[in-house]
A protein has these predicted regions:
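Conserved N-terminal beta1-alpha1 strand-loop-helix module at the mouth
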Residues: 1-81, 86-114, 130-133, 140, ...
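Active-site beta->alpha loop and helix N-cap motifs at the rims of alpha/beta catalytic domains
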Residues: 65-66, 120-122
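Glycine-rich beta-strand-to-loop/alpha-helix junction loops that act as flexible
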Residues: 118, 150-155, 173-175
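Short, glycine/charged-rich beta-strand-loop motifs at protein surfaces that mediate ligand recognition
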Residues: 125-129
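Internal alpha/beta core interface subdomains
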Residues: 169-170
Length: 181
């Protein structure tokens, strides 16, 4: 959800993580100060740990390392891979958004990213997407590379089958989970 009260959201998160096979939870909160992010992590990280779910912080490798998150996800406009890796160290996960670019994904992989993300595949309410990703990118990546890839952007139970068939290792779902009745 775009805005959350972590004390209330904690129960919703536990229910969502317990409802199926969830590989990771990414905390993405914008427009708040660092202390709010820290407090949110303090409340939600134990929920993910209790479910055996990897906890990834969006955009902030410094806070991911400081607060004990399992990793960080960075976009093309965030800290670069090398800076993120230096902050979180070799044991934590660093994932990189690559939009629809094979080149960006190969660079991220060569630098040592733990996964790459392609998208947005569908219209999304989570953020303004400036690129439209194509199934061919997933197909090519899954045929040529061993590094896991994540499909992002507007993914629902109804529109995800082609992404899985094209080779996405993971699906990032936001609204489909949090807007579900």
């Amino acid at each position: 959800p775009p805005q959350i009260d972590p004390k209330i959201f904690r129960d919703d998160l536990a229910a969502a993580l317990g409802a199926g096979d969830v590989g990771a939870f990414q905390l993405r909160i914008k427009g708040v100060d660092d202390d709010t992010i820290r407090r949110t992590i303090d409340i939600l990280l134990p929920v993910a740990e209790a479910q055996g779910t990897t906890f990834i912080l969006n955009d902030r490798p410094d806070l991911a390392a400081e607060t004990g998150c399992d990793g960080v996800h960075i976009g093309q406009d965030d800290a670069g891979y090398k800076e993120a890796r230096a902050c979180v160290g070799p044991e934590r996960i660093v994932g990189v958004t690559c939009k629809n670019s094979r080149h960006l994904a190969m660079v991220a992989g060569e630098q040592g990213a733990d996964y790459v993300a392609f998208g947005a595949f569908f219209p999304t309410q989570t953020k303004q997407a400036d690129t439209q990703a194509e199934l061919e990118t997933l197909e090519w990546w899954s045929e040529m590379m061993v590094l896991p890839c994540v499909a992002i952007g507007g993914i629902t139970a109804e529109n995800c089958p082609p992404l899985v068939r094209a080779g996405a290792d993971f699906l990032s779902v936001v609204s489909a989970v949090w807007n579900h009745p």
